[in-house]
């Protein structure tokens, strides 16, 4: 059974002025996401600035989200690392704290071989028994999962149940689904490719857009599931200007700017990420207004 179906939010990590995690604000955001119809919370992912969090912060933020959500919807913990031992430790802590699943990004910077990726993921998943979702985003990690590697992992590692596919390559997605033969739950990792991936057999999205429009992304998925393909497609196309604006600078710079424009007060970003350029903010603001978010 899938961990979730529909729209999972890759939620931002709100920060105080001193750049500590703002748990009060995170609590508010979790409640708003649940009220907006989000189908799952993905905590401490790329959008959550996991790369600049300490292991202690990572574990504490994950634990907080699990406790506050309290089984109302699934919580998936981003526990990937470019260090296999670190990923194992984070994954074990997430399991102990009650996570419904883990999201495992490919090891960044190291540029592991495909055999290295198999060894990495196998080692992590042998240490836990909760479901694991692979995360393929080579544009950020410099390391991509090939379709045959995904198929091997899905076949040989029992608790690898899904993949967040953010390569942007529809052919890669099709090959993964073909080789896995119905044995993998595929989630779009790109907000501009949700409907195309659903059409190929995906079951949802792990979304940045959901931070600012949870009901919209949920509805786009469930229109598709209910057979209203035209309605879902229209929502996908209508959202493209905002999606483009949310990625005109590296994620999560624009989405934090968008949330602050909405009065959510999620704070700034940890270095080396910097505030969004003013010219880009104007483009983002217009796109949000055009979609009715502002």
Over which residues does each language-model region extend?
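Glycine-rich phosphate-binding "P-loop"
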Residues: 136-137, 159-160, 270-271
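Alpha-helix N-capping/helix-start residues
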Residues: 17, 23, 55, 147, ...
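Short, amphipathic alpha-helical "lid/cap" segments that border enzyme active or binding sites
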Residues: 23, 27-30, 147, 281-288
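Catalytic cores of TIM-barrel enzymes
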Residues: 2-3, 175-178, 259
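Catalytic alpha/beta core domains of metabolic enzymes, predominantly
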Residues: 126-127, 140-247
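A general structural signal for well-ordered alpha-helical segments in protein cores
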Residues: 26, 58, 62, 87, ...
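C-terminal alpha-helical cap/extension of soluble enzyme domains
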Residues: 6-14, 36-38, 199, 206-294
């Amino acid at each position: 059974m899938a961990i979730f179906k529909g729209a999972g939010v890759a939620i931002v990590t709100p920060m105080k002025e001193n750049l500590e995690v703002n748990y009060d604000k995170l609590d508010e955001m979790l409640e708003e996401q649940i009220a907006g119809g989000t189908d799952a919370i993905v905590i401490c992912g790329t959008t959550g600035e996991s790369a600049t969090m300490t292991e202690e912060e990572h574990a504490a933020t994950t634990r907080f989200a699990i406790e506050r959500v309290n089984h109302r919807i699934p919580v998936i913990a981003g526990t990937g690392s470019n260090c296999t031992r670190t990923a194992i430790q984070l994954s074990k802590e997430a399991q102990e704290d009650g996570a419904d699943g883990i999201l495992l990004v490919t090891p960044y910077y190291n540029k592991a071989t495909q055999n290295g990726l198999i060894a990495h993921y196998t080692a992590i998943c042998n240490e836990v028994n909760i479901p694991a979702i692979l995360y393929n985003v080579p544009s950020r990690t410099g390391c991509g999962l090939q379709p045959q590697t995904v198929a091997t992992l899905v076949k040989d590692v029992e608790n690898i149940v899904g993949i967040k596919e953010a390569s942007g390559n529809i052919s890669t997605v099709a090959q993964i689904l073909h080789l896995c033969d119905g044995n993998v739950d595929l989630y779009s990792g790109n907000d501009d490719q949700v409907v195309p991936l659903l059409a190929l057999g995906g079951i949802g999205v792990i979304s940045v857009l959901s931070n600012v429009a949870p009901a919209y992304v949920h509805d786009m998925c469930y229109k598709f599931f209910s057979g209203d393909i035209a309605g879902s497609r229209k929502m996908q196309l209508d959202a493209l200007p905002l999606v483009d604006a949310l990625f005109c600078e590296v994620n999560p710079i624009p989405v934090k700017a968008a949330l602050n424009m909405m009065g959510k007060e999620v704070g700034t970003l940890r270095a080396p990420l910097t505030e969004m350029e003013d010219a880009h903010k104007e483009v983002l603001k217009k796109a949000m207004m055009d979609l009715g978010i502002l």
